[in-house]
Amino acid sequence: MNQKPTTGLSQNQIKLIAAAAMVIDHVGVELFPQLTILRIIGRLAFPVFSYCICEGSRLTHHPWKYFFRLFGMGLLCVIGYYVYTGMFYGNILITFSLSLCVLYAFQHLQTCWSQDKITARFAGVGIMLGCMAGIWLICRWITIDYGFFGVILPLFAELSACIWQRYAGADGKQEPARVLGFSVGLLVLSLQMGGIQIYSLLILPLLFAYNGTRGERNLKQFFYWFYPVHLLLIGLVSMWI
């Protein structure tokens, strides 16, 4: 990924904005539940991280290492939440882990479809449909943050980019199409969830301003540990108050 200075916002910049929104959201949940504005601000976080999962699935050199790192951190949070509340909850990292499975299945489908073999194409379609069906069942049996539509949200971006490249003849410049497809998916998710989730659409101008670069500093470890650490700190504060 090109790291030279460009106009627009880097991935690190939009993720830091999303991280701040997430902290505000969780502070609202635990400490100030009467302040709806904090929850509204928090709606800006999920779309950014979901879109970055889409980016990460394409750019990582170690796909399954990426998955297991994310899933492992999510599982750690699931255990912590169960110890704290006595309830099982599939947090946002579990959602994103399942999103990666969908995206990897779609990438495999694209590889199979590029082969001039009917068996390979059928295999790719079968794996994709099986993955989608399996995740739908998981979301039916277990409470997963943002549900099935939240899991498949990044897929809207990849589908849009694929269609753009195939039919519009885009010369590798798929980012606007990717964000546009993601916007459609986010609208579907917002309408499906209802309530204040519609405010998540306010983040779209920032996503359209994304310049396709990661940023000058490597903040990967920070973002991996940010989620469990900030939840732990907010939980401790709520216990003391």
Give the predicted meaning of each segment.
Residues 1-241:
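Alpha-helical transmembrane segments and their immediate juxtamembrane cytosolic regions
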